C-alpha cells in the first residue's frame, strides 16, 4: 500500500513538473487526421514525458474502477475494460518506441532511460495487483462457458498468461 501511494505521489510530482497544456499535447486526444494516424509534425520531444505520465495516471484510474466494480467479473467488465484502460499510454508508447527504434536521437535515448523505471514499476503494479488478477482469474476459470469468439479467447488467454508469467499466482514464500 505504501509503495502504491509513493508511486502515485511520484507520478503526480513528475506530471506537475513537466506539465504542458492539454490542448497543445497531441497525445492527449485522438489524432485528428483522415485515418487517425499521428501528426508527426505536431509531436515534439517535450510532449512525450507528460503524455506517458498522464497515460499512467489514466490507466491507474481505469484499473481502480475495474477492481472496485461491485459487478461479478465478466469478459466485458474485466478483460475488455483492462485492454482498453490506457488509450493515452497506448498512443504515446506506440509512437515513442517506434521513434526510438527507427530514428532515435540523444534526447529520445535520454528520455527512454529516464522513463524506463517509471514504466517498469507501472507494469509491475498492474501485473502484481492481486485484486485485478483475481478478477482476471475468475473470468479465465469460466472461459469454457462464456461462448467467446476466437479473438476473445485469445485476448483472455494472453491477459491471463501475462499475469501468470509476471508472478501473480506465486505464493508469498
Describe the function of each predicted region.
Residues 18-173:
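Zn2+-dependent metallopeptidase catalytic domains
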Residues 1-23:
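Bacterial Sec-dependent N-terminal signal peptides
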Amino acid at each position: 500500500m505504501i509503495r502504491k501511494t509513493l508511486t502515485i505521489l511520484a507520478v503526480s510530482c513528475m506530471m506537475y513538473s513537466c506539465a504542458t497544456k492539454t490542448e497543445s499535447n497531441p497525445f492527449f486526444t485522438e489524432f485528428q487526421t483522415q485515418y487517425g494516424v499521428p501528426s508527426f509534425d505536431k509531436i515534439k520531444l517535450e510532449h512525450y514525458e507528460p503524455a506517458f505520465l498522464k497515460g499512467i495516471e489514466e490507466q491507474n484510474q481505469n484499473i481502480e474502477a475495474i477492481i472496485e466494480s461491485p459487478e461479478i467479473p465478466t469478459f466485458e467488465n474485466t478483460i475488455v475494460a483492462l485492454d482498453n484502460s490506457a488509450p493515452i499510454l497506448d498512443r504515446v508508447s506506440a509512437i515513442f518506441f517506434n521513434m526510438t527504434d527507427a530514428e532515435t536521437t540523444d534526447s529520445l535515448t535520454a528520455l527512454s532511460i529516464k522513463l524506463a523505471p517509471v514504466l517498469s514499476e507501472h507494469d509491475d503494479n498492474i501485473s502484481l495487483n492481486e485484486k485485478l488478477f483475481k478478477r482476471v482469474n475468475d473470468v479465465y476459470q469460466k472461459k469454457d462457458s462464456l461462448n467467446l469468439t476466437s479473438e476473445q479467447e485469445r485476448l483472455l488467454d494472453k491477459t491471463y498468461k501475462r499475469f501468470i508469467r509476471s508472478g501473480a499466482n506465486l505464493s508469498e514464500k
